[in-house]
A protein has these predicted regions:
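Membrane-embedded alpha-helical segments that form the functional core of polytopic membrane enzymes
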Residues: 23, 29, 41-70, 141-152, ...
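Acidic (Asp/Glu-rich) catalytic motifs at the cytosolic membrane interface
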Residues: 62-92, 221-244
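Multi-pass membrane catalytic core of lipid/isoprenoid biosynthesis enzymes
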Residues: 84-134, 240-277, 345-351
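Functional transmembrane core segments of multi-pass inner-membrane proteins
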Residues: 170-232, 250-253
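Extended hydrophobic alpha-helices typical of membrane-associated regions
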Residues: 272-366
Length: 366
């Protein structure tokens, strides 16, 4: 049991939400199309939707675990974590999820860690292959290979790109547009849609979904910024030149604040323009009429009351989202990285929660 505990600790499960958030957001967007009646799916294909969704979550989760093990292995070989146990704690004296801890500290050999990298990646690939077969999108195979190569060479190889300032961009790309849009394609095609029948065919809808993919990608990049700002001095000593190390803590904090501000604007735009404005106002104006919002969710009908409550919850969560975004910016500005890390994860999860609740709005703009 102790050995299992060490492996779970090395997997750094507290980072999993960052990998799963883009998948959950994409599932929510597809569900809005599905339950709004904008797209028609035969009843038996609902099962495909559920299975495909779980498979997509599995791919993201095990790929994230594989990346964590790979970073543990590669950074350990380069001695990057040797001095990190000496870094300052947060104001309340709490460490950040034992970030300085490595599997080697538990006596686990590097070769075993490398095996863990391979096993996690293999499980992710198996799930990905099933998704490919069910959806018929064979481009997922080369895309998956690119993801595997990118995951390894972030910290592995003789010239890891994560040591040359590309880590934040990589986190944004693979945990944003790639994961989000890839999940959307997997769900649409696995549900029996042809290229001509997909609701995302219009340029405006494609642009809409690409912009939405920036939200989870941005939070992934922010998480890496926090990590790299915290370790900037140590990284430079070990010749790991991250974007934050190049900018310095002051300029890096400013860039971080701008990115968080941009993500808040995107999140607000989604909630206010695409959920609240397009549907909520119409429902308020129709109170007193026999009109009901038709939705195939919850036994085929979602009445005005439930819809209004869901919108109110969305606004409350958005308020909390903005407050925590402010706290996150303040934490990074004050170099309180121990508290900034969990705040960033919570923000990403709140963002995903608003997407899930938006399913009750039943439709996307068109």
């Amino acid at each position: 049991m102790t050995n299992i505990k060490f492996w779970l600790k090395g997997a750094r499960l507290y980072t999993l939400p960052i990998g799963i958030v883009p998948v959950v957001m994409a599932i929510s967007i597809f569900a809005r199309y599905l339950f709004s009646g904008q797209i028609l799916v035969k009843p038996y294909n609902i099962e495909n939707f559920v299975i495909q969704s779980l498979l997509c979550i599995g791919v993201a989760a095990f790929m994230q675990i594989s990346v964590n093990y790979a970073n543990d292995y590669c950074d350990g070989l380069r001695g990057l974590d040797n001095q990190r146990s000496k870094r300052e704690l947060s104001a309340d004296g709490k460490a950040l999820c034992d970030v300085s801890w490595r599997l080697a500290d538990a006596g686990i050999k590097p070769k075993s860690v490398l095996y863990a990298v391979g096993i996690s990646a293999l499980i992710s690939c198996i799930f990905g292959l099933i998704i490919t077969i069910k959806s018929g999108v064979w481009l997922f195979i080369p895309l998956g290979l690119v993801c595997l190569v990118a995951a390894w060479f972030y910290a592995g190889g003789s010239h890891p790109y994560g040591y040359c300032g590309w880590g934040e961009f990589s986190a944004f790309l693979f945990f944003g547009p790639v994961a989000f849009l890839g999940t959307l394609c997997a769900l649409f095609y696995a549900s029996g849609f042809s290229k001509d029948s997909i609701a995302l065919a219009s340029v405006s809808q494609i642009a809409f979904c690409v912009l939405l993919s920036f939200i989870p990608g941005g939070f992934s990049a922010c998480l890496m910024m926090i990590n790299n700002l915290r370790d900037a001095e140590s990284d430079i000593r070990h010749k790991k030149i991250t974007a934050m190390a190049l900018l310095g803590k002051r300029k890096g904090s400013v860039v971080f604040s701008c990115v968080v501000g941009f993500l808040v604007i995107l999140q607000l735009s989604y909630v206010l323009l695409y959920v609240f404005y397009t549907r909520f106002i119409g429902v308020i104006l129709s109170i007193g009429n026999p009109y009901k919002i038709v939705c195939t969710l919850n036994s085929g009908l979602l009445n005005k009351g439930v819809f209004i409550v869901s919108c109110i919850l969305l606004l409350l969560i958005t308020y909390v989202f903005i407050k925590k975004a402010h706290l996150l910016i303040c934490a990074v500005s004050n170099s309180d990285y121990a508290n900034a890390f969990p705040l960033c994860v919570k923000l990403a999860m709140l963002g995903a929660l608003t997407f899930v609740l938006s399913i009750f709005a039943c439709s996307l703009p068109h």
